[in-house]
Amino acid sequence: AEVFKSEEGSVDFYGQLRPA
């Protein structure tokens, strides 16, 4: 699954926001 990571946290392929 693709995951977007940033300083604020990350969002997985399903759109779930996860803490940094």
Swiss-Prot record:
GO terms for biological process: monoatomic ion transport. Keywords: Cell outer membrane, Ion transport, Membrane, Porin, Transmembrane, Transmembrane beta strand, Transport. The keyword Membrane applies. It is found in: Cell outer membrane. Its main location: membrane. The keyword Transmembrane applies. One of its GO terms (molecular function) is porin activity. GO terms for cellular component: cell outer membrane; pore complex. It comes from the Bacteria. Belongs to the Gram-negative porin family. Homotrimer. Forms pores that allow passive diffusion of small molecules across the outer membrane. This is Outer membrane protein 40Va. It comes from Vibrio alginolyticus. The lineage of its organism: Bacteria, Pseudomonadati, Pseudomonadota, Gammaproteobacteria, Vibrionales.
